[in-house]
């Protein structure tokens, strides 16, 4: 029995076979990524992942003013860090703020996410820093399943349902994707939002609304937030807006007017400002403590 649906996978108002095949692919992808999630049995063999858990643990203890928080890990070298939730003045002071991770190889948002979920988990049970892998790794797995879905959407957009499903299936079974999903690192999140950014670029070209540029900026900021080395993604942003100028005049260069360029330039500026804002919110001390960041 088919269910009535207005979903993009529907055909004539009925859920098509494509939906069910994609659902199977996503379920298989999730199962592969969650299998063996406790692969290191708590020994934290991955150094970057270990740093994220331990720094987020120390930050959580400092924010909650736990006894001995200033003697926790990296905080021993930060005697000016003030315990408790920061006020506005403390928040913008790189030395006193408890939210400054003093560590920038990877995006600060990864640490903040762990602190946020730690505060929720602690409402129900005590948990140590390394046991937060039971939260971090499933989040990474879910992000990579989102990547599988985005691969389908892009493949479908470019070449049709068959290619979209084939690409999603290969991505679901890709060893490197499955491996990265077993670490709480930036790769799975950055890939997801990078693909989502490409989808948003396409959407912006089709709909040409200011809202679509805002969505594009948001997704670009989320792509860069976990890993600053993704900054080159801004190059396609420039190209896609220039393509939009040409598309508006159907490729006739002589019809390009200053007013048209200014209007589309304003859309591009909005996307850039939102992307920069998202990055600042997710990693404020990359700017406030820029000497340590660079």
Q: What name fits each language-model region?
A:
Residues 191-192, 214-216, 229-247:
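Transmembrane-embedded, aromatic-rich helix segments that form part
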Residues 134-158, 196, 200:
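Transmembrane-helix motifs of polytopic, lipid-linked glycan transferases
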Residues 47, 176-189:
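Short acidic/glycine- and proline-prone juxtamembrane loop motifs at membrane-interface regions
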Residues 20, 25, 124-130, 151-173, ...:
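Transmembrane-helix signature of polytopic, membrane-embedded enzymes
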Residues 32-35, 52-88, 103-114, 122-125, ...:
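Transmembrane-lumen/periplasm boundary regions of multi-pass, lipid-linked membrane glycan transferases
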Residues 158, 162, 197-213, 223, ...:
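Membrane-interface transmembrane helices that cradle and orient dolichyl/undecaprenyl
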Residues 29, 167-172, 199, 220, ...:
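Short helix- or helix-capping micro-motifs
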Residues 1-33, 146-149, 156, 165-166, ...:
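Start-transfer (signal-anchor) and selected internal transmembrane alpha helices
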């Amino acid at each position: 029995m088919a269910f009535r649906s207005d979903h993009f996978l529907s055909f004539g108002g009925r859920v098509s076979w494509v939906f069910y095949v994609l659902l199977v692919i996503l379920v298989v992808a999730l199962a592969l990524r969650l299998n063996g999630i406790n692969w290191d049995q708590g020994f934290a063999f991955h150094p970057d992942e270990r740093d994220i858990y331990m720094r987020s643990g120390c930050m959580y203890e400092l924010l909650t003013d736990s006894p001995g928080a200033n003697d926790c890990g990296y905080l021993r070298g930060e005697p000016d860090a003030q315990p408790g939730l920061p006020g506005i003045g403390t928040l913008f002071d790189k030395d006193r703020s408890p939210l400054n991770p003093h560590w920038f190889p990877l995006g600060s948002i990864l640490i903040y996410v762990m602190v946020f979920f730690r505060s929720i988990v602690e409402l129900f049970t005590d948990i140590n820093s390394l046991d937060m892998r039971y939260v971090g790794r499933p989040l990474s797995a879910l992000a990579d399943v989102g990547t599988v879905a985005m691969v389908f959407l892009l493949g479908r957009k470019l070449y049709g349902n068959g290619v979209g499903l084939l690409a999603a299936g290969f991505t679901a079974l890709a060893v490197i994707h499955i491996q990265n999903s077993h670490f709480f690192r930036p790769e799975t999140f950055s890939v997801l939002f990078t693909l989502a950014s490409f989808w948003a670029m396409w959407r912006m070209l089709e709909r040409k609304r200011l809202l679509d540029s805002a969505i594009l900026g948001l997704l670009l900021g989320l792509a860069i937030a976990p890993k600053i080395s993704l900054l080159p993604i801004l190059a396609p942003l420039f190209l896609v807006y220039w393509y939009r100028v040409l598309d508006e005049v159907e490729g006739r260069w002589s019809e390009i007017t200053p007013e048209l360029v200014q209007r589309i330039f304003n859309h591009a500026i909005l996307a850039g400002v939102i992307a920069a804002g998202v990055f600042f919110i997710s990693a404020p001390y990359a700017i406030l403590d820029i000497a340590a960041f660079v």
